[in-house]
């Protein structure tokens, strides 16, 4: 049931996400190529449209500003985008959830992204105050919308969605031109191609054309921020839907094998009688085939319904992150068919394997008790080690080694249970590790202030004078394009000092990394994915100012878990750019008591593009990831419970049924039920204990594989599993074992001693 439900839920979630993506992208014409630049005349779109292979072009303004929301002390960052025209040639069209599209008039009307509206409970006709390019303006919400460009609404400067402090707004072109001070000008274009295979050639032409306008680099849809997260989740669902259910299906095959083997063993006399009366092997086998078929239905049908429930729950969780026009759980006929086949496979593997016993049984042989198993000397006897074992210990290890196949299967099954718990808990471990290192060890500031343009050192002195500000550090962020062999990528480069105390760089061993006076430091992504090594040279093209191009030596790597980036010594960067000392990002360490007062004063500073309070960012990060982890962990732990109970309980039942006559005989001879219990319990406990180490190793392997499924551009997570997680998984199995042993003691107490006095023949 567990394997079927996981397979159905994962495959259906994959199908549902893919279907929602494809229909939304196609119906609302998601662009193939994107480009941002400093400023260009609106007429640039005519030149772009005349390029071979270009089907549609949309020129627009894309600019960030501050938003004042009633009831929220902190300002939010708004990304203001030109409203797409209502025509067939528009790209990245809006899907209206509520209201209407904005119209030109005395008031500035806007459409707001559903994520921001939902977070603040905004309604149609609500008013907000925004500041764009230092100009304050009241805007009225007339519609709540979504777009294929912002399915995953993420601030490019933040690692995770924070819908309380970041929102998308669409404004009519003329009004946005006025607010952005860009009359008849644009700073962003999107294109749709006749054939996406032409993307590389078209991008080269776009870069050449836009170079004089301060081009920051054109890029394909696959590098678009929202699309990266969408594709990453779809890919994870597809892969996880393959290897996780396989674990449960193998366990199911083992359980079916145990049940059928036990039935055939207990019913040997009846099988012999039927065969003696003339029933053929196939007729007797058909009885067990029917049992297998019923077991398949009992496991598969509820599994499909449980898969539908889990898939629906998963879709509801996705709706808080991914904003599609229609994201509904789609249980396809193919998923149902796959579920039925998946339920059939373990039954066939586990059941038919035992049916050969029926064909091998002759009536005369089956009417007698089974021939005692032939014990052969083990390595303990060969090395004469048995003298160090008590009689009871010899009985235990001989019983364990009598059926090595069953022992190995049981260990693998319990190992799967332990591994599933480790997978479920490890994501919380990795989340805690990232928070501890990214937000506490590396980022030691309380507030981060970004400016629209680089400012002189005087801005740091001005911020330091604010009451409650304890420490100020400035950085220079520059957009660059890095090139190495056939690779190229647009990333931010930060110029900083080595003595910075509020933003530290660390390596994978959590040691602080210093920036040499020459060269560039890169995030670990470029080592893993591009194969860049220390000492290699890369080409850095600066995407602002004079658009200089330099070749720099890679002097090392840092382990930043979120996003891509590069780092240089600030003085070296100033020399390369030919600038005086300037900063466009300033981090503040503040007195927590004065944080509210400082934030209020920061609102009055001109040219601020965003103010990020670390504790709010951390809270949003924990809520965003924590929600997904809770759903995932709950499902996995439930399935682990089913596996543990199924394997341990069935194993005990089989062992008990095989040795019930011997246990009854011992009790007739005067053994107390505790003494009989102590003969059986250690054997079961040893089998469980033998699964601990393989289970932990399997858990680590599965965590490693699941981490590798995450796109390295979104989260470059290390494989972190705390000791407490291993202990928790083992404790979980021990609790199941304890309840199972209590049950076996109860069964021993209820043994009918008269059965031991009967002649077995």
Range-by-range predicted roles:
Residues 1-250, 262, 281, 438, ...:
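Membrane transport/envelope proteins' first extracytoplasmic loop
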Residues 273-282, 361, 400, 667-675, ...:
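Short helix-to-coil transition segments within interhelical loops
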Residues 361-378, 747-761:
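Short cytosolic juxtamembrane segments of multi-pass membrane proteins
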Residues 26, 32-38, 391-517, 521-525, ...:
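Juxtamembrane segments of multi-pass membrane proteins
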Residues 7-14, 238-273, 284, 425-429, ...:
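A hydrophobic alpha-helix feature that marks transmembrane segments and, especially
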Residues 1-30, 261, 310-318, 360, ...:
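Alpha-helical transmembrane segments
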Residues 1-2, 263, 280-281, 289, ...:
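N-terminal Sec/SRP start-transfer signal
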Residues 253-265, 269-272, 293-325, 333-360, ...:
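Small-residue-rich transmembrane alpha-helices
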């Amino acid at each position: 049931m567990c394997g079927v439900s996981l397979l159905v839920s994962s495959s259906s979630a994959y199908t549902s996400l893919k279907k929602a993506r494809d229909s939304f992208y196609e119906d609302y014409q998601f662009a193939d190529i994107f480009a941002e630049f400093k400023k260009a005349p609106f007429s640039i779109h005519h030149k772009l449209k005349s390029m071979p292979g270009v089907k549609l072009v949309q020129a627009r303004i894309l600019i960030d500003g501050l938003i004042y929301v009633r009831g929220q002390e902190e300002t939010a960052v708004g990304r203001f985008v030109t409203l797409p025209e209502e025509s067939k040639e528009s790209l990245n069209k809006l899907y209206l959830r509520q209201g209407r599209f904005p119209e030109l008039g005395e008031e500035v009307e806007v459409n707001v992204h559903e994520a921001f509206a939902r977070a603040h409970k905004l309604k149609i006709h609500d008013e907000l105050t925004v500041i764009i390019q230092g100009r304050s303006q009241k805007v009225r919400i007339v519609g709540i919308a979504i777009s294929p460009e912002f399915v995953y609404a993420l601030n490019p400067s933040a690692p995770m969605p924070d819908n309380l402090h970041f929102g998308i707004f669409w404004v009519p072109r003329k009004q946005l031109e006025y607010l952005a001070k860009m009359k008849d000008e644009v700073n962003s274009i999107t294109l749709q191609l006749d054939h996406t295979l032409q993307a590389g050639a078209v991008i080269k032409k776009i870069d050449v054309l836009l170079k004089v306008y301060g081009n920051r680099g054109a890029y394909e849809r696959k590098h678009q921020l929202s699309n990266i997260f969408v594709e990453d989740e779809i890919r994870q669902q597809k892969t996880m839907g393959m290897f996780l259910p396989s674990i449960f299906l193998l366990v199911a095959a083992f359980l079916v094998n145990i049940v059928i083997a036990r039935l055939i063993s207990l019913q040997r006399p009846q099988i012999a009688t039927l065969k003696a009366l003339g029933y053929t092997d196939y007729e007797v086998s058909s009885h067990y085939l029917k049992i297998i078929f019923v077991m398949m239905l009992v496991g598969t049908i509820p599994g499909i319904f449980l898969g539908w429930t889990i898939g629906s729950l998963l879709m509801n969780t996705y709706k808080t992150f991914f904003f599609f026009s229609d994201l509904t759980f789609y249980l396809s006929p193919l998923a149902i068919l796959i579920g039925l086949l998946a339920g059939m496979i373990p039954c066939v593997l586990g059941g038919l394997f035992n049916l050969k016993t029926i064909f091998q049984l002759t009536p005369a042989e089956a009417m007698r008790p089974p021939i005692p198993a032939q014990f052969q000397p083990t390595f303990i006897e060969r090395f004469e080690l048995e003298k160090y074992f008590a009689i009871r210990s010899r009985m235990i290890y001989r019983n364990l080694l009598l059926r090595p196949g069953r022992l190995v299967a049981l260990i693998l099954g319990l190992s799967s249970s332990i591994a599933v718990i480790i997978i479920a808990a490890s994501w919380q471990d990795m989340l805690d590790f990232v928070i501890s290192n990214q937000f506490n060890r590396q980022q030691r500031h309380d507030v981060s202030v970004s400016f629209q343009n680089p400012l002189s050192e005087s801005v740091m002195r001005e911020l330091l004078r604010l009451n409650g500000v304890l420490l100020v550090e400035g950085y220079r962020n520059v957009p660059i394009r890095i090139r190495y062999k056939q690779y190229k990528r647009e990333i931010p480069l930060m110029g900083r000092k080595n003595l910075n105390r509020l933003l530290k760089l660390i390596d994978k061993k959590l040691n602080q990394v210093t920036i040499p006076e020459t060269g560039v430091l890169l995030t670990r992504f470029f080592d893993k994915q591009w194969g860049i090594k220390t000492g290699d040279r890369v080409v850095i093209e600066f995407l602002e100012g004079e658009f200089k191009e330099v070749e720099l030596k890679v002097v090392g790597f840092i382990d930043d878990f979120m996003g891509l980036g590069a780092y240089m010594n600030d003085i070296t960067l100033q020399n390369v750019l030919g600038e005086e000392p300037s900063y466009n990002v300033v981090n503040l360490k503040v007195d927590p008591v004065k944080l509210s007062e400082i934030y209020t004063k920061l609102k009055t500073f001109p040219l601020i593009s965003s103010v990020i309070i670390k504790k709010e960012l951390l809270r949003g990060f924990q809520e965003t990831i924590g929600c997904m982890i809770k759903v995932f962990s709950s499902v996995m732990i439930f399935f682990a419970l089913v596996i543990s109970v199924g394997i341990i309980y069935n194993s005990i039942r089989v062992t008990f049924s095989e040795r019930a006559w011997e246990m009854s005989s011992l009790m007739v001879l005067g053994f107390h039920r505790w003494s009989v219990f102590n003969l059986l319990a250690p054997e079961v406990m040893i089998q469980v204990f033998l699964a601990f180490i393989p289970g932990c190793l399997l858990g680590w392997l599965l965590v490693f594989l699941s981490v590798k499924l995450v796109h390295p551009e979104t989260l470059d997570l290390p494989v972190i599993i705390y000791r407490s997680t291993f202990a928790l998984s083992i404790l979980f199995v021990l609790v199941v074992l304890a309840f199972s042993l209590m049950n076996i003691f109860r069964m021993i107490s209820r043994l009918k001693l008269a059965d031991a006095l009967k002649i077995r023949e």
